Amino acid sequence: MRTLRVAWVAALLLVPVLCSAHPLRLSLCQIEYSSQAATLTVSLRLFLTDVNEALVFDPYSRALRFAEADESENAEPLLLAYLVEVFSLEANGELLPVTIQSKVLGGAGEDTTLSIGFSHPLAAPLRSMTIKNVVFTDLFFDQTNIVYVHVDDDSHSMMLSKSTPSHTLEF
Protein backbone atom coordinates (compact mmCIF):
# COMPACT_ATOMS: atom_id res chain seq x y z
CA MET A 1 0.00 0.00 0.00
CA ARG A 2 2.83 2.39 0.85
CA THR A 3 4.49 1.71 -2.54
CA LEU A 4 1.22 2.48 -4.30
CA ARG A 5 0.89 5.75 -2.38
CA VAL A 6 4.48 6.76 -3.25
CA ALA A 7 3.86 5.94 -6.92
CA TRP A 8 0.65 8.01 -6.87
CA VAL A 9 2.41 11.02 -5.33
CA ALA A 10 5.27 10.70 -7.85
CA ALA A 11 2.75 10.60 -10.71
CA LEU A 12 1.00 13.71 -9.37
CA LEU A 13 4.30 15.54 -9.16
CA LEU A 14 5.08 14.70 -12.79
CA VAL A 15 1.77 16.04 -14.16
CA PRO A 16 2.80 19.74 -13.99
CA VAL A 17 6.15 18.92 -15.58
CA LEU A 18 4.54 17.01 -18.45
CA CYS A 19 1.78 19.58 -18.95
CA SER A 20 4.01 22.65 -18.80
CA ALA A 21 5.68 22.19 -22.20
CA HIS A 22 3.85 23.73 -25.11
CA PRO A 23 2.23 20.73 -26.78
CA LEU A 24 2.15 22.14 -30.29
CA ARG A 25 5.03 21.73 -32.69
CA LEU A 26 4.10 24.54 -35.02
CA SER A 27 4.96 27.96 -36.27
CA LEU A 28 2.73 30.57 -37.85
CA CYS A 29 3.60 32.68 -40.85
CA GLN A 30 1.46 35.44 -42.30
CA ILE A 31 2.25 36.97 -45.68
CA GLU A 32 0.32 39.98 -46.89
CA TYR A 33 0.44 41.78 -50.21
CA SER A 34 -1.48 44.89 -51.13
CA SER A 35 -1.40 45.87 -54.79
CA GLN A 36 -2.08 49.47 -53.71
CA ALA A 37 1.00 49.61 -51.46
CA ALA A 38 3.00 47.22 -53.73
CA THR A 39 4.61 45.77 -50.60
CA LEU A 40 4.94 42.19 -49.40
CA THR A 41 4.92 41.90 -45.59
CA VAL A 42 6.00 38.75 -43.73
CA SER A 43 5.37 37.93 -40.08
CA LEU A 44 6.70 34.74 -38.46
CA ARG A 45 5.57 33.66 -34.99
CA LEU A 46 7.78 31.05 -33.33
CA PHE A 47 7.80 29.53 -29.85
CA LEU A 48 10.81 31.01 -28.05
CA THR A 49 11.77 27.62 -26.56
CA ASP A 50 11.95 26.19 -30.09
CA VAL A 51 14.10 29.11 -31.28
CA ASN A 52 16.50 28.57 -28.37
CA GLU A 53 16.60 24.81 -29.04
CA ALA A 54 17.48 25.45 -32.69
CA LEU A 55 20.16 28.06 -32.00
CA VAL A 56 21.82 27.14 -28.70
CA PHE A 57 20.49 23.59 -28.12
CA ASP A 58 18.84 24.62 -24.82
CA PRO A 59 15.14 25.52 -24.96
CA TYR A 60 15.30 27.42 -21.67
CA SER A 61 18.48 29.36 -22.37
CA ARG A 62 18.47 33.05 -21.53
CA ALA A 63 21.77 33.65 -23.32
CA LEU A 64 20.32 35.40 -26.39
CA ARG A 65 17.50 37.39 -24.71
CA PHE A 66 15.62 38.13 -27.94
CA ALA A 67 13.74 41.43 -28.14
CA GLU A 68 14.89 42.47 -24.66
CA ALA A 69 16.87 45.59 -23.76
CA ASP A 70 19.99 43.49 -23.10
CA GLU A 71 19.68 41.27 -26.19
CA SER A 72 22.95 39.50 -26.96
CA GLU A 73 24.90 40.93 -29.88
CA ASN A 74 24.96 37.39 -31.34
CA ALA A 75 21.19 36.91 -31.14
CA GLU A 76 20.08 38.52 -34.39
CA PRO A 77 22.95 37.19 -36.57
CA LEU A 78 22.32 33.64 -35.26
CA LEU A 79 18.59 33.94 -35.85
CA LEU A 80 19.03 35.39 -39.33
CA ALA A 81 21.51 32.67 -40.34
CA TYR A 82 19.00 30.03 -39.21
CA LEU A 83 16.05 31.67 -40.98
CA VAL A 84 17.96 31.98 -44.26
CA GLU A 85 18.48 28.19 -44.16
CA VAL A 86 14.89 27.23 -43.39
CA PHE A 87 12.65 29.94 -44.87
CA SER A 88 12.51 31.44 -48.33
CA LEU A 89 10.05 33.43 -50.35
CA GLU A 90 9.96 34.00 -54.10
CA ALA A 91 7.74 36.63 -55.67
CA ASN A 92 7.30 36.46 -59.45
CA GLY A 93 10.21 34.02 -59.62
CA GLU A 94 12.58 36.36 -57.75
CA LEU A 95 14.05 35.24 -54.43
CA LEU A 96 13.44 37.89 -51.78
CA PRO A 97 16.09 38.32 -49.11
CA VAL A 98 15.11 37.27 -45.59
CA THR A 99 15.74 40.13 -43.19
CA ILE A 100 14.76 40.97 -39.63
CA GLN A 101 13.12 44.37 -39.34
CA SER A 102 11.25 43.74 -36.10
CA LYS A 103 11.26 41.30 -33.17
CA VAL A 104 8.58 41.20 -30.47
CA LEU A 105 8.06 38.82 -27.56
CA GLY A 106 4.52 37.77 -26.66
CA GLY A 107 2.89 35.42 -24.18
CA ALA A 108 4.50 34.03 -21.06
CA GLY A 109 6.35 30.97 -19.81
CA GLU A 110 6.30 27.99 -22.17
CA ASP A 111 3.92 29.85 -24.46
CA THR A 112 6.26 32.80 -25.06
CA THR A 113 6.52 33.54 -28.76
CA LEU A 114 9.00 35.50 -30.82
CA SER A 115 7.38 37.42 -33.67
CA ILE A 116 9.69 38.40 -36.49
CA GLY A 117 8.66 40.80 -39.23
CA PHE A 118 10.02 42.13 -42.49
CA SER A 119 8.71 43.61 -45.73
CA HIS A 120 9.81 44.16 -49.31
CA PRO A 121 8.50 46.49 -52.00
CA LEU A 122 7.59 44.80 -55.29
CA ALA A 123 8.12 46.67 -58.57
CA ALA A 124 5.72 44.50 -60.59
CA PRO A 125 2.25 43.26 -59.60
CA LEU A 126 2.34 39.94 -57.76
CA ARG A 127 1.66 37.05 -60.17
CA SER A 128 3.19 34.11 -58.28
CA MET A 129 4.65 33.28 -54.90
CA THR A 130 6.65 30.27 -53.71
CA ILE A 131 6.99 29.79 -49.97
CA LYS A 132 9.46 27.37 -48.38
CA ASN A 133 9.08 26.97 -44.64
CA VAL A 134 10.93 24.12 -42.91
CA VAL A 135 11.41 25.97 -39.62
CA PHE A 136 12.24 23.46 -36.84
CA THR A 137 11.60 20.39 -39.04
CA ASP A 138 15.22 19.43 -38.42
CA LEU A 139 14.44 19.33 -34.66
CA PHE A 140 10.93 17.91 -34.45
CA PHE A 141 9.57 15.15 -36.68
CA ASP A 142 5.99 16.38 -36.17
CA GLN A 143 6.67 20.09 -36.79
CA THR A 144 4.00 21.84 -38.85
CA ASN A 145 4.37 25.34 -40.22
CA ILE A 146 1.06 27.05 -40.92
CA VAL A 147 1.19 29.77 -43.58
CA TYR A 148 -1.56 32.30 -44.25
CA VAL A 149 -1.31 34.34 -47.44
CA HIS A 150 -3.48 37.41 -48.05
CA VAL A 151 -3.24 39.04 -51.47
CA ASP A 152 -5.66 41.95 -51.67
CA ASP A 153 -9.05 40.25 -51.11
CA ASP A 154 -7.78 36.72 -51.86
CA SER A 155 -6.71 34.48 -48.96
CA HIS A 156 -4.97 31.10 -48.86
CA SER A 157 -3.71 28.87 -46.07
CA MET A 158 -1.33 25.93 -46.15
CA MET A 159 0.49 23.59 -43.83
CA LEU A 160 4.15 23.02 -44.65
CA SER A 161 6.32 20.33 -43.08
CA LYS A 162 9.37 18.19 -43.70
CA SER A 163 7.41 16.10 -46.23
CA THR A 164 5.82 19.19 -47.87
CA PRO A 165 8.44 21.93 -47.52
CA SER A 166 7.13 24.43 -50.07
CA HIS A 167 4.08 25.58 -51.99
CA THR A 168 3.54 27.80 -55.02
CA LEU A 169 0.56 30.09 -55.52
CA GLU A 170 -0.47 31.72 -58.81
CA PHE A 171 -2.52 34.93 -58.87
Show which residues each predicted segment covers.
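Bacterial N-terminal signal peptides that target proteins for export
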Residues: 1-11
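Intrinsic disorder/low-complexity segments
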Residues: 11-14, 163
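N-terminal signal peptide c-region/cleavage motif recognized by signal peptidases
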Residues: 16-18
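N-terminal soluble domains immediately following signal/targeting peptides that reside
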Residues: 22-171
